[in-house]
């Protein structure tokens, strides 16, 4: 079987549902099988995966850090829907400054983007999988 390129759409938070952890495990499997993961786009409640203030208990899996490490190692982009993020209090330094907010909390390796970024990713990937 030939290698395929994938885009993942994650709509569940890092904790509280299985959507994000299932997406992470799926991403691991894709990479292990030799496929290319191009983009992970976090939408709706999925934007919480990019919150650097998430602090799981010491005996819990740190999904935010896991996404960061995987993206760095395998060189794929992680986009956070800017509109969904702003509604849920996940912001980068630029947005914090523009909105006169005291702190930014977007984790390193994640980028605020519009839905156009998702549309572009869907056009270039062989497969799009939503979690």
From Swiss-Prot:
What's its EC?
A: 2.8.1.-
Gene3D superfamilies referenced in this protein's UniProt entry, alphabetically: DsrEFH-like
One GO CC annotation, please? sulfurtransferase complex
An MF annotation (GO) of this entry: sulfur carrier activity
Could you tell me where this protein is found in the cell?
A: Cytoplasm
Annotated keywords: Cytoplasm, Transferase, tRNA processing
Q: Kind of enzyme, top EC level?
A: transferase
Q: What is its main location?
A: cytoplasm
Name the Gene Ontology biological process terms: tRNA wobble position uridine thiolation
Q: Has UniProt tagged this entry with the keyword Iron?
A: no
Q: Which residues carry out catalysis? A: 81
Tell me the first and last residues of the signal peptide.
Answer: none
Q: Which Pfam families does the record associate with it?
A: DsrE
Assembly and binders: Heterohexamer, formed by a dimer of trimers. The hexameric TusBCD complex contains 2 copies each of TusB, TusC and TusD. The TusBCD complex interacts with TusE.
Q: Which family does it belong to?
A: Belongs to the DsrE/TusD family.
Q: Which PANTHER family match?
A: PROTEIN YCHN, SULFURTRANSFERASE TUSD
According to its UniProt entry, what is the function of this protein? Part of a sulfur-relay system required for 2-thiolation of 5-methylaminomethyl-2-thiouridine (mnm(5)s(2)U) at tRNA wobble positions. Accepts sulfur from TusA and transfers it in turn to TusE.
Query: Which protein, by its recorded name, is this?
Result: Sulfurtransferase TusD
Q: Which organism is it from?
A: Photorhabdus laumondii subsp. laumondii (strain DSM 15139 / CIP 105565 / TT01)
Q: What is the gene name?
A: tusD
């Amino acid at each position: 079987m030939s290698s395929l390129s994938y885009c993942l759409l994650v709509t569940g938070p890092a904790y509280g549902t299985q959507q994000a952890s299932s997406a992470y495990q799926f991403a691991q499997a894709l990479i292990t099988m030799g496929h290319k993961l191009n983009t992970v786009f976090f939408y709706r409640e999925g934007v919480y995966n990019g919150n650097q203030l998430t602090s799981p208990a010491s005996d819990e899996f740190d999904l935010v850090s896991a996404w960061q490490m995987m993206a760095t190692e395998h060189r794929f982009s992680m986009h956070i829907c800017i509109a969904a993020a702003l509604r849920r209090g996940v912001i980068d330094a630029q947005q914090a400054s523009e909105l006169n907010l005291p702190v930014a909390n977007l984790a390193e390796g994640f980028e605020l983007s519009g839905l156009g970024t998702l549309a572009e990713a869907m056009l270039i990937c062989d497969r799009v999988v939503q979690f």
